[in-house]
From Swiss-Prot:
PANTHER family: CDGSH IRON-SULFUR DOMAIN-CONTAINING PROTEIN 1. Belongs to the CISD protein family. It is a single-pass type III membrane protein. It catalyses: L-cysteine + 2-oxoglutarate = 2-oxo-3-sulfanylpropanoate + L-glutamate. The chain crosses the membrane at residues 14-31. It comes from Mus musculus (Mouse). Residues 32-108 are cytoplasmic. The gene is Cisd1. This is CDGSH iron-sulfur domain-containing protein 1. It comes from the Eukaryota.
Amino acid sequence: MGLSSNSAVRVEWIAAVTFAAGTAALGYLAYKKFYAKENRTKAMVNLQIQKDNPKVVHAFDMEDLGDKAVYCRCWRSKKFPFCDGAHIKHNEETGDNVGPLIIKKKET
């Protein structure tokens, strides 16, 4: 009688652990499918600039820059690739600390 009751308890525990593991796996898969995709776009830096290109690249000759050039690094500028100060609003909204890239001639 003692042996069969231990077997019944083991079967119940195995069933409970299997159910819990299955529930956890389904929860994880649901999280990955729905929640992670929603947050992926929020983590993107470039939300609107040349989205049809696989990689956004701008190149300038140093001689063409003049004395100073200020480039956007927050991807929010309406004058991209040049900075228009949009990082100020971006920093206030997100708590970020991004600023422009400033390239200027060395003062002699």
